[in-house]
Amino acid sequence: MGGMRLGFTPFNAELDYEAAFPLAAELGLDLEVAYDLHEAFPLPGARELRATGEALGVGFTLHLPFVELNPASLIPSVRKLSQERLLRALEFGEALGAKVGVLHTGLSPVRHPVAERLAWEALEETLALLRDPPLPVALENLALWERALVRGPEELRRLLERHPHFGFCLDVGPALVELGP
């Protein structure tokens, strides 16, 4: 996946793209494009963003969809829709020229051994579907969510060992919360 480069999500910083591009160029940062927002709002398309990024020397990462999405859903129709959205997002990321797509691994809202086993099987199905993506995919740590299927660094490490073609995206905030005081 190459070396590490820092980036930021403009919308988390309450910046539109017009303000975010010059800041990213000045600081030598990538922009993390949140695909969910491009599904929900009238925002510039992938090719327009790519052209602006190329003109200013700004690269991109793509945060794959996570709003109302669960790649580990126990409900087959929800999982199928989640998979379809992920594939569309990867096409968007390819057109954007994104260096990587960042993936949340899903939720397990039902804490029962059978439900958790089925959720893990569902996640494995989704990850198999993403085995040959048009851009690298990195799995993100999610310690902040009690309902996260993958909990803790050891579970994430084991998942990445089973799927070495995926990278890892460290979200420092959840990692610090998980470490505790």
Please describe what each predicted stretch is:
Residues N12-E14, Y35-L37, F66-E68, T105-P109, ...:
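Active-site-proximal loop/turn and secondary-structure-junction residues that shape catalytic pockets
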Residues L43, L149, V177:
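Nucleotide-sugar-dependent glycosyltransferase donor-binding/catalytic pocket residues
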Residues I75-G167:
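Active-site acidic/histidine proton-transfer and metal-coordination neighborhood
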Residues L179-P181:
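A short alpha/beta connector and helix-capping loop motif
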